[in-house]
From Swiss-Prot:
Lineage, broadest ranks: Bacteria, Bacillati, Actinomycetota, Actinomycetes, Bifidobacteriales
Top-rank taxon: Bacteria
Entry GO terms, CC: large ribosomal subunit
Disulfide bond among keywords: no
Gene Ontology MF terms in the entry: structural constituent of ribosome
Region (Disordered): 1-20
Organism name: Bifidobacterium adolescentis (strain ATCC 15703 / DSM 20083 / NCTC 11814 / E194a)
GO BP term, pick one: translation
The name this protein goes by in its record: Large ribosomal subunit protein bL32
Amino acid sequence: MALPKYKTSRANTHSRRANWKAKAAQTVTCPNCGAPTLPHMACPSCGSFRGRVYREAVRSIHTK
């Protein structure tokens, strides 16, 4: 396995990591209630997704 021949300076390290940042999550508005939701996910406030209501399935309690 190859090893670095020289130590990477702080300036090179910081300049390389300058563009390494997190993006803001992209949201869409729920057509049912208007709340912001993640795309392709059920709405957390009303529980609907693509015309169906999935709130009961999300809040169900599984027992053994």
